[in-house]
Structures are given as C-alpha cells and as structure tokens.
C-alpha cells in the first residue's frame, strides 16, 4: 500500500472519529474505593493487575483484537492511546498500541499476511518465515506493524512469542516488553496466563526502585523511578523523539493505576513503612493526585541484600553478581558504604547496558518492518511532540 495523500487524509479522518470515545474513556475499578482498600488486594489472584476499562473503551479495544483472524493467546493494550497522559490536549488522539503474544509466529504471520497484506512493508515479499525470523532474531523479539487502520482506529501492534514474553518478564533479557508492562496495561485476552508471569516483573521493578531511592521517599518518586527504567537506554530520549516530560506525564495522569499496581506490593514489602496514618489511607481517593503518600524504608545490609536477591537474572549478571547469598551480601555491604546517588548511578548504568543495544537494533528493524515512509511519519510525529514539549507549544 502506498502511504500517500489518500492515507494521510484517511488517517486524519480516523483521528477525528476516534476521539469520540478517546475523550470519554475512563476506568471503573476505583469507584467507591479507598487507598486502604487497594492495600488489601489479593496478590495471589493478581487483583492489583486487573485494570478494567469502561465498557465503551473495552468494546473498542476488543473489537480490534477480534478483527484478526490469526490466533492470539494474549492481547495487551498499552500506552497513551489507552491511558491518557498529561500534556495531551483533547484534540490529540494518540495511536493505540497493542502487543499480541502468539503460539506460532510463522503460522500467525502467514494467516495475517493473507488477511492484512497492506499492514506489512516490502518484507512481506519474502514470506512468513522471513518475517518470523526478523521478529525473533533481531532486536527485542517483537515485530511491529505501525500506523495501520483496524476497525476505525489507527493502531500499532507488536507480535511476539510466548517464550520471548516470559523470558523478558522473568529475567529481563532485553527489558523491552518488561518495561512496558511495568506500567498500567489492559489485558484483553489471556489474563491469567499473563498476570502470573508479570507478577515477577512488577516485583523486580519495585525492588530496583527501592534500591535507587533514599530511606525516605514519596510514591511519586517511586513511580517515576520505575517508569524511567525502560527509557534509560532509549536513544529517542536523547534526540528529542520523546517528550522530555514523558515520565512525569505518565505518572501524574495515571496515579490511580500505579497505586493499584504497586501499593499492595509495597504494603507486603518487609522494611517499608507507610508514614501516613490509617485514617488518611481509609479516606484517600486513589485518583487524588493533589498529594502523594510518603514512605520510610530500612536501609541495612540485610535489606539491600534481600532486594538484590529479588532482581532479575540478567540484571544480576550485569551488576557482576553471582546468584548466591554471599555475593549479594558483599554487594550490599559495598552499596551501604556509598551514597544513594552512587548506588542509583550503578543500577542506572547497568540497566542502560542491558537495554541500549536491543533498543537500537529494534529501532533499526523498525525501518524495515514499517517501511521508510511509515517510519518517517512515526519519527516525525515523535520529534514534533518531543520538541514542542521541550520548547513549548
């Protein structure tokens, strides 16, 4: 398909029609709920991950997923097209992002190439086997089709395998998928299968966040730290291809969802203490972003060692640790003698080392999978948003 004037016209029309539900979409799971109730969510049933959108939004997202004839095991909606971010006007309607976990990538692309050949760039000419190889052997194990029309929406969807999803969530092989799923997402299909694996990922993100923070911190500090992890090796942040205030915008607009995800984990974390009284927690609305909860964590050799023991395998390796108690204890003792800024810098550099190469190769792969013109449109939109955010509208 030629991405010319006709497509630009239809794209603008779709952006306008999409805003009818985008401007109204909201989430219902916080109705008549307090922060105190969020703390008591059942982590064994993954209650903290079950974010339920309003029916109108859920129907629209589900309609997109059901459009595809190729079988999808797990479907995830994420990003600013699903969750509003601060800094967007009501006239702006971001592209809707999806991740599709599939059982057999070759079979999936074969069916999808027959149904949606226009979604693919010139690589479709080499067949589903080549597409699948490009997906799994280069970058982050995800193949994206971007700026395509599905059921009246402009979407981007990434296709990945079960193996790549689970390895990244548990071990942070590239942290590409894990980083996205550390933020609020909507699971449209395959909930229980996904939640179990992502629980490891959320705990890992929390442990990293605590290691990078001082003994006293606010929940806003914690959520910003967690969100920033996936952007540490992202070259787009260096070249203004992302909003420089993106992290703050995500947290401030989605505070209720971050509280739902992480407050029960904090509540169950040994050595972390809520400073606010129980009366405050019982009266506080999860959506209230006019104030943030404060915490105190015990920073001792034992507490640091325990947090290190909860890190994913690949980060442990990059930190130069062996997965045994004595190695964690030695590192904890060293971290304890250094300032918090030194400890935070060490972890930041390690995560950047973990993510930067895979993000770079994924970006290069995107030029081929999206095609030159679609890639230009995508990068232009990112640059425009990033530069406008830096210098003002």
Curated annotation (Swiss-Prot):
InterPro entries: Tam41 (IPR015222). Its main location: mitochondrion. Its cofactor is Mg(2+). Pathway: Phospholipid metabolism; CDP-diacylglycerol biosynthesis; CDP-diacylglycerol from sn-glycerol 3-phosphate: step 3/3. Keywords: Lipid biosynthesis, Lipid metabolism, Magnesium, Membrane, Mitochondrion, Mitochondrion inner membrane, Nucleotidyltransferase, Phospholipid biosynthesis, Phospholipid metabolism, Transferase. It is found in: Mitochondrion inner membrane. It is a peripheral membrane protein. GO terms for molecular function: cardiolipin binding; phosphatidate cytidylyltransferase activity; phosphatidic acid binding. Its EC number is 2.7.7.41. The keyword Transport does not apply. One of its GO terms (biological process) is CDP-diacylglycerol biosynthetic process. GO terms for cellular component: extrinsic component of mitochondrial inner membrane; mitochondrial matrix; mitochondrion. It is an enzyme of class 2 (transferase). It catalyses: a 1,2-diacyl-sn-glycero-3-phosphate + CTP + H(+) = a CDP-1,2-diacyl-sn-glycerol + diphosphate. Catalyzes the formation of CDP-diacylglycerol (CDP-DAG) from phosphatidic acid (PA) in the mitochondrial inner membrane. Required for the biosynthesis of the dimeric phospholipid cardiolipin, which stabilizes supercomplexes of the mitochondrial respiratory chain in the mitochondrial inner membrane. Belongs to the TAM41 family. This is Phosphatidate cytidylyltransferase, mitochondrial.
